[in-house]
Amino acid sequence: MAGNTIGKVFRVTTFGESHGTALGCVIDGMPPGLELSSDDLQYDLNRRRPGTSRYTTQRSELDEVQILSGVFKGTTTGTSIGLVIQNKDQRSQDYSEIKDLFRPGHADYTYEKKYGIRDYRGGGRSSARETAMRVAAGSIAKKYLKIQTGIVIRAYLSAMGDIKCPFESWEEVEQNPFFCSNKNKVFQLEELIKKLKKTGDSIGAEITIIAQNVPVGFGEPVFDRLDADLAHALMSINAAKGVEIGDGFSVVNQKGSENRDEMTPNGFKSNHCGGILGGISNGENIFLKVAFKPTSSIRQSGNTINKNNEKVKIVIKGRHDPCVGIRAVPIAEAMVAIVLMDHLLRFRAQCAK
């Protein structure tokens, strides 16, 4: 199976399965000289990890990361950084009854047809459990970007189902289990999740990511445009079904006179483009949105087929998120950080800045 690596200079390769022994990643291209410890990674891992809220999956993983290589006396050496997280709370028996069935909305069918074999325990490699290593790698990128350029990457839940959550404050984002910036919406979100858990259903969500203080010049025309790489990275997250950059799909209803970001000697008058022009960052904040589909693993009975192509009913047991978008906030931040880190190093290599 290919496709486990992202980046050209700052390269992140992940490995491991949902119910395997461990998850891991190798990071190549990390510059030397950054002070780094596992504590730097643990903050974001704790934000993502399961079992921390009654509104997410109750699988209880500590997600304690171990740095295997690339750091000496608390400082990066420039060599490959190896990271590993042990899986502690697998419950593979939850999947024994459906091991020969294809779960609707999951990768079971496509993995089986392509590879002829699949790990049915929690989806194996296709599980969002894999994203723990992305968050770990992204934490390293976030720290380096902030120190070197002042870049700050933050995200929040901007919608869950038909509940819109307009931005209010970054402080509020870390004060509730939904990563919602609007405290007036938290009760509605709680009630929605309670209702979904009672009915055994799930719901989709929208995450907004903002990267501040990004310098002018990140991105490479034509096929390595910054917006293309960001979209690629965000769409690689499990359950992601759409990405918007800047005004996104609302540009369909705009006129050119409305959409163009006019310039003055003091800077841009607007930011409809979301901080990227011609595939290159323009110095404005980068605005992105990601849409996540509802969790496919639900307790409601549904129709599917088995390995013999026979029609069967399926009810999925186990511990699953009623809304995967909640824990996607630190994952989305990590993917944006990995892309910006890669483009920072590429920018330096080409432009010597």
Swiss-Prot record:
Catalysed reaction equations from the record: 5-O-(1-carboxyvinyl)-3-phosphoshikimate = chorismate + phosphate
Cofactor: how bound: Reduced FMN (FMNH(2)).
Binding site for FMN: R125, S126, S127, N238, A239, G278, K293, P294, T295, S296, S297, R319
Presence of the UniProt keyword Membrane in the record: no
Documented EC number(s): 4.2.3.5
PANTHER family: CHORISMATE SYNTHASE
Assembly information from the UniProt record: Homotetramer.
The protein, known as: Chorismate synthase
